[in-house]
Amino acid sequence: MSVLQVLHIPDERLRIVAEPVKEVNADIQRIVDDMFDTMYAEEGIGLAATQVDIHQRIIVIDVSENRDERLVLINPELLEQSGETGIEEGCLSIPEQRAFVPRAEKVKIRALDRDGKSFELEADGLLAICIQHEMDHLVGKLFIDYLSPMKRQRIRQKVEKLDRMKAKAAG
C-alpha cells in the first residue's frame, strides 16, 4: 500500500470522466487500499480515483471520527435524492479553500463494495454530502463549479500560489 499524489486544480486531468470498473480484482483492491492510505495521509474524508489520476469509477469515504468506518463505492449510481442542505465544502484537490455548496439532504445509491458485491445505501448528513461531492469528481466536476466565475477564479489563483510556495520550499 502506498500514498498516491493528489492532483490539484488547475490540472485538467481532474476534468476527465471516469470509466466504469469492468471487474473488481486484486488490482482494483490495491487501488482502493492505496486510496484509503492517501485519503488518511491527506486528512480527507473522501477521495475519488480521478483525484489520484486513476480514471475509474472508484470512491473511498470515511466520515467517522475514529477513522474506522471505511466505505468503498465502485461504479456508484445515484438512485434517489431528496431535500436540500449544504455546508462549506473543502477538497483535497483544492487545498485550504472552502465554499458553501448546495446539496441534496438525502441520497440513495447503488454500488459495488471492495469485493465486487452490489449493495444499496441510504445516506444523509455529512455522508450524503460527501457521496455527492465524490460522485461529482467521477464526471469531472469540482465543488468550485457551483460558484460564481469570480469566486472560482479567486480560489484557483490562491491554490496556484500555494502550490508555487510549496514547490519553492521543497527546493
Swiss-Prot record:
Listed Gene3D superfamilies: Peptide deformylase
Catalytic machinery residues: E134
GO molecular function terms attached to this record: metal ion binding; peptide deformylase activity
GO biological process assignments: co-translational protein modification; translation
Positions contributing to Fe cation binding: C91, H133, H137
Superkingdom classification of source: Bacteria
Cofactor annotation remark: Binds 1 Fe(2+) ion.
Reaction(s) catalysed (UniProt annotation): N-terminal N-formyl-L-methionyl-[peptide] + H2O = N-terminal L-methionyl-[peptide] + formate
Assigned keywords, A-Z: Hydrolase, Iron, Metal-binding, Protein biosynthesis
Pfam families, alphabetized: Pep_deformylase (PF01327)
This enzyme's EC code(s): 3.5.1.88
Cofactor: Fe(2+)
Role according to the record: Removes the formyl group from the N-terminal Met of newly synthesized proteins. Requires at least a dipeptide for an efficient rate of reaction. N-terminal L-methionine is a prerequisite for activity but the enzyme has broad specificity at other positions.
Entry similarity comment: Belongs to the polypeptide deformylase family.
Protein name: Peptide deformylase
Organism of provenance: Cronobacter sakazakii (strain ATCC BAA-894)
Gene: def
